[in-house]
């Protein structure tokens, strides 16, 4: 999917904290009916858009059905057309996924993925194989909604949150670093925000902060 908010990258040379160290907020940060829309800009050009919608899964309030779509603008379509869709079905009590569906169309490349999570037995079926895990696992979209519900008032600047996540049939520790609090101004107005950046492995595309 198109990169939405993440614009900063950091190295791994710092202490890491698993998200399980932080309790979930009693009041959930999202609910059925929520709709989010982001504009992705490259300078003065609207490069694309990302949309998220939360709904009950087959009218079953025990699960959230989150659908995320990422698509390039008409201008960018001429060069690199993107039409991505992500779906995650999340247990509303634990906020861990039970299913993940991904459909990607980017340029000339396209593929689909469907994962089934058995969090109780700590197993994941990716359509071909069953992968055993040592802990509960998020998918690449459910971890965002899980993170929104963490109580982070005691989070210190420089700390890193780690999210064990199943991506492309492998388990990765996705990490984000807390950069502090910041007042931001966007088209919708002024907001108090918590600032994070993703952590990337040294020796890959980005090597320095």
Each predicted region: which residue ranges?
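Bacterial Sec-dependent N-terminal signal peptides
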Residues: 1-20
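Acidic, serine/threonine-rich low-complexity disordered tracts
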Residues: 17-117, 155-209
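Hydrophobic, well-structured mid-protein blocks that either form specific transmembrane helices
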Residues: 109-153
